[in-house]
Amino acid sequence: LSTPSEKALEEKAEAFINSHPSSLVSIYLLEKYFVQKPQPDFSLIKEMTEHMTGGLKDRPYVDELLDLIQEEEKVSVGKTIPYVNLPNAKGTQISRTSFKDKYLLIHFWASWDPQSMEANAALRRIYKKEEKNKLFALWGISLDIDRKEWEEAIKRDTLKWEQSCDFSGWNTAPIKQLAIQALPANLFLSPSGKIEGKNMSEEDI
């Protein structure tokens, strides 16, 4: 969450962007205060870009941002997740259908990301609490590029739930398919594959 001072800066930046729809400064402020947040509010970003003039919208950065927003909207809460599959450590392809009739929390992480390690600690608590719940499952998708480091992190952090990685880093297909912008991230799915929540806290889960 934003601190009071950060919130005030964001409000000023938003006011400037909305009142200066043709200024290059608006692009800078949009990037600095909204796009670069750990969990961007894409609905707000879309609203602000809609106020921009055609000249700004034709700029490569804004054009790419609009494409990103379009991808994000495809995987917003209430939408059905697209088909994704990745191998686990044994080489078996894992997908949402591997967790049939279960609520599924997909967690995106990497061994090189300190915040992912903190998230793994929270997930261990959730797993311990829900381990016997036959209607709930966890699936970790890693952005590691080194198999040894990935396997060592799984062992070190005692990640007993299903784990997948294709060692492509940020180029792994689910990252683009699911519009993941930062780590750690998560998606909470209903048994039918509908997205019920995104980037949920331990308390919310």
Task: Give the location of each predicted region.
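Conserved redox-active cysteine motifs that mediate thiol-disulfide chemistry
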Residues: 100-101, 108-128
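Alpha/beta-hydrolase fold active-site loops
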Residues: 103-104, 184
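Thiol/disulfide oxidoreductase modules built on the thioredoxin-like
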Residues: 159, 166-205
